[in-house]
């Protein structure tokens, strides 16, 4: 769709009608994720100016309100689209039959996820603020706060810690 090879909803199992693919501006974080997770090295088509949105909220509202026909398509970060901003006229689509949810993102059955890591130097002093924050985030209280904020622990919910020989960093996989 975003390479303009498919331009009509009937080509993807929908009712006949043109697909209106909204995009973000090239410098946005969601556009960067779109390029990484969906385009995978392919170049997207140049969209009409009115389909390029400067904010995630603008994209969500633009897709939800576009001419009332349901012909618009867009992308956003799950957390933002469903929990922070939201729009009752927006429908989140399944990918390969898997709908986005905290559960499907956490168990990685939803294919479009992005991991976040907290990385600190292995030689970071034990009393440093960054080590204190990392250690606190890995406590039950820290995990509970992250879950309350709707971050999702990946890989069966367990943070990963590693520091190998010659590796000057310690890392902890945080929910993404």
PLM features per residue range, with description:
Residues 1-176:
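Flexible loop/hinge segments at secondary-structure junctions
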């Amino acid at each position: 769709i975003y390479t303009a090879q498919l331009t009509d909803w009937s080509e993807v199992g929908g009712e006949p009608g043109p697909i209106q693919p909204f995009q973000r501006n090239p410098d946005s974080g969601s556009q960067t994720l779109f390029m990484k997770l969906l385009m995978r090295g392919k170049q997207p088509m140049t969209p009409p100016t009115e389909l390029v949105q400067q904010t995630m909220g603008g994209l969500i509202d633009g897709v939800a309100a576009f001419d009332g026909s349901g012909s618009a398509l867009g992308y956003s970060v799950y957390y933002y689209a469903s929990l922070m901003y939201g729009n009752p006229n927006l429908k989140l689509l399944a990918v390969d039959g898997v709908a986005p949810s905290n559960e499907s993102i956490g168990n990685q059955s939803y294919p479009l996820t992005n991991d976040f890591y907290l990385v600190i130097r292995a030689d970071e002093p034990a009393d440093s603020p960054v080590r204190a924050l990392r250690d606190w985030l890995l406590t039950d209280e820290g995990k509970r706060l992250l879950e309350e904020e709707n971050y999702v622990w990946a890989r069966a919910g367990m943070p990963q810690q590693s520091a190998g020989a010659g590796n000057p960093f310690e890392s902890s996989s945080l929910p993404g």
